[in-house]
UniProtKB/Swiss-Prot annotation:
Pfam family, one: Peptidase_M35
Reaction catalyzed: Preferential cleavage of bonds with hydrophobic residues in P1'. Also 3-Asn-|-Gln-4 and 8-Gly-|-Ser-9 bonds in insulin B chain
Keywords: Cleavage on pair of basic residues, Disulfide bond, Hydrolase, Metal-binding, Metalloprotease, Protease, Secreted, Signal, Virulence, Zinc, Zymogen
Name of the protein: Neutral protease 2 homolog AFUB_100460
Record's function text: Secreted metalloproteinase that allows assimilation of proteinaceous substrates. Shows high activities on basic nuclear substrates such as histone and protamine. May be involved in virulence.
Catalytic residues identified in the record: 301
Family: Belongs to the peptidase M35 family.
Length: 355
């Protein structure tokens, strides 16, 4: 029933590229094969002005993030790396890249480290999305990026030899032993708040202001509203389970991928959610319109987990400017669209078209 609601909603809107603003600068990505599953990406500033952007969750991020999408026979290959939620201000300088007009940089990575390509054969590689622009170490906007389509013939024997970026852990418990003392208290409060906010957001998606809904999802269709409500209800249900749901929750980082810019991350392939140190510096619930807090960070991460509501979301547009520039079909598949909508409904953000 979950899949049907989302599938019918996506079929109800045009299947197309990301909605891009007029006259926007852009990054062009050229993908090429280095050796079997090892890929090189050349990132070029194709605009006329110097730009500084956040390269986390993007090319040059050393963590096993989703840099490209892989397809076999038009079906996307499951991603087995991590999806991070970043801080929106106070970004460290080492998270930023500056490119002059026409300038480039390169990144090499092995796609077999974050996807099971052991059966070999033809695989199509491509990518597109938005990357955040930074000013004064704060996310201040976005620029679109897109790549060529790269066709590979994967050698299965060589793909098997590539080590996975994420090593499996013992996941017998749902809220792990890392969640004790104050961190357990913080997590339980955050889960309760996330459940309440997601539930209210689900109601707003179903029957609230059409102008508010359109601000985030670019549609007033009943199917679209039902699909958004269904995912948010599933998130509210998961947050109410107190460890008995589909996700495994870590209050500290067992894999070593947190840094000073990452609030939390999710491993969609195993439905694991990890809080980083930065998570504990956030407010429980913010009153700032489109601000970050613990509750909506959990909402963001739970939408990534397919065990909560399949399929899990991507990070197609990060932050309010990028998320609200997405087409309907892409907003439905974007984690921050749900977190921002939930924040907007709970803190009564006033939209320009609010009715």
């Amino acid at each position: 029933m979950k899949i049907t609601a989302l599938a019918s909603a996506i079929l109800a809107v045009a299947q197309g590229a990301l909605a891009l603003p007029a006259r926007a600068p852009a990054l062009d990505i050229t993908l090429s094969q280095v050796n079997n599953t090892r890929i090189k990406a050349v990132v070029k500033n194709s605009g006329t002005e110097k730009i500084t952007f956040v390269h986390l969750n993007f090319f040059n991020d050393p963590s096993p993030v989703k840099k490209v999408s892989l397809y076999r026979n038009a079906t996307e290959v499951e991603f087995t790396g991590i999806k991070q939620r970043l801080r929106s201000d106070g970004l460290s300088n080492d998270a930023l890249t500056t490119l002059a007009p026409g300038a480039t940089y390169e990144d090499e990575f092995d796609i077999a480290s974050t996807a099971n390509l052991t059966q070999g054969g033809p695989v199509t590689v491509r990518t597109q999305g938005f990357v955040p622009i930074a000013m004064n170490n704060k996310i201040a906007g976005y620029i679109p990026y897109s790549s060529n389509e790269l066709e590979l013939e994967v050698d299965a024997e060589k793909a098997v030899a590539v080590p996975a970026s994420i090593k499996p852990l013992d996941r017998r418990t749902k809220i792990t032993s890392s969640c004790t003392g104050n961190r357990a208290t913080v997590l339980n409060t955050a889960l309760r708040n996330a459940a309440s906010i997601a539930s209210k957001a689900a109601d707003a998606a179903s029957s609230g202001s059409s102008a508010l809904f359109t601000e985030y999802f670019k549609s007033t269709s009943g199917n679209i509203r039902s699909a958004v409500a269904a995912r948010l209800k599933a998130v509210a249900s998961e947050a109410s389970m107190n460890g008995g749901g589909s996700t495994t929750y870590y209050c500290s980082d067992p894999y070593g991928y947190c840094d000073s810019n990452v609030l939390a991350y999710t491993l969609p392939s195993t439905n694991e959610v990890v809080n980083c140190e930065l998570f504990y510096t956030l407010q429980e619930v913010t009153n700032d319109c489109h601000g970050q807090d613990q509750a909506t960070t959990i909402i963001h991460e739970f939408t990534h987990a397919p065990g909560v509501y399949p399929p899990g979301t991507e990070d197609l547009g990060y932050g309010y400017s990028a998320a609200t520039a997405l087409s309907t079909s892409n907003a439905l598949n974007n984690a921050d669209s749900y977190a921002l909508f939930a924040n907007g409904t709970s803190s009564f953000c006033v939209m320009t078209a609010f009715s």
